[in-house]
Amino acid sequence: MALIKTYEHLIALRTLVGVFEAGFAPGILLMLSSWYKKHEQSKRFAVYISAAVLSGAFGGIIAGAITGGMEGTAGLRGWRWLFVGLHRSLLASWLLMLTLSQIIEGAATCVWALVAFFLLPDYPANTKRLSEQERELAVSRLEDDQGHGQTEETAHISSIQALTQSVRSWKVWIMIAGYMVIVGSSTLSYFYPTLVAGLGYSAVKAQFMVVPIYAVAFVCVGVTGYFGDKYPKVRGLIISGWLVVSLTCAIVICVVYGYSARYALLVIMAAGLWSTNGCALSYAASTFGDMPRETRAVSLALVNALGNLAQIYGAYLFPEKDQPKYLLGFGVIAGMCAFGVFVYALAHILFRKYIRT
């Protein structure tokens, strides 16, 4: 992408990037769920999600610094320095910087992929990083937790069999429905600067005011991960509780006119939505723990892939014409959160009944 010159080429390459990166998130989910017990997974998934939260916080700081510090430089508004090709006299230098940036980012990704290939262990049953005794211990601790453990002698099933078992599992579809709600509501994060600017802040200050939103969310994600592992049998209720918080904030923010109050509600709502994400993934992974490894891999991939389809419609929830109240967007999020409360409360009841029987 560093060298392309047309929109069509950009779309084609972005599609390829999506194809090549499609296995990353499901792979992370499978890796974590393959090594840790059910009551150990929420904290690990929280660390995984917190990386995205931190990137949002640093992104706000960088955008604010550039927007404010570069204001008027070379005759350009500060926000224009966040983009490329907006001034003919600077086009060549900006294209060079963009090219170098993309090359560096791409090269760093490739280098880290090679490092990860040697650093990341395989499954507990066949990793060469552990001794025979350590492998037996790793498998036995998972067997004690999940009721079974897969060794090298365990019969494998085909990809078609795994897919068939996955799509026939009612547990998978409950988790897909719940995760679609969370991802769809979490597209709110795309509009943080726009929403904050609508509360009366300048464009520069709006970028910096996004940082506390992510900072509070970062803390809440960690706390939720801790309690998700401390009380693993009520993860569904923990998720439902956070969705109730976000639902309440989404409703109240539609009728509150004070800028400070709306900002505080936005912070709390964002914290609730981010906190449900990691907990929902660990809930799904632990729920699928009794499945064969191949089926669990497909099931986690389906939850991640179908759940993220919600980003398609989520990107249209806050059109410019709805500012500054954005009643449509917050109303839809409130509705999705309400449905999510029902889904995860139902999941809690059904899964506990399934375990007892």
List PLM regions with ranges.
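Hydrophobic alpha-helical segments of secondary membrane carriers
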Residues: 47-52, 178, 298-306
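Hydrophobic core of transmembrane alpha-helices in multi-pass small-molecule transporters
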Residues: 9-23, 31, 261-279, 283, ...
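Central mid-sequence intracellular linker of multi-pass
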Residues: 38-52, 72-163, 328, 334-357
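Small-residue-rich segments within alpha-helical transmembrane domains of MFS-like 12-TM solute carriers
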Residues: 2, 6, 18-26, 35, ...
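Extracellular/lumenal inter-transmembrane loop segments of multi-pass membrane transporters
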Residues: 1-11, 19, 33-43, 50-87, ...
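Extracytoplasmic gate region of multi-pass secondary transporters
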Residues: 161-226, 236, 281, 312-315
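Structural signature of the two symmetry-related core transmembrane helices
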Residues: 236-252
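Transmembrane alpha-helical segments of major facilitator superfamily
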Residues: 52, 209-217, 303, 307
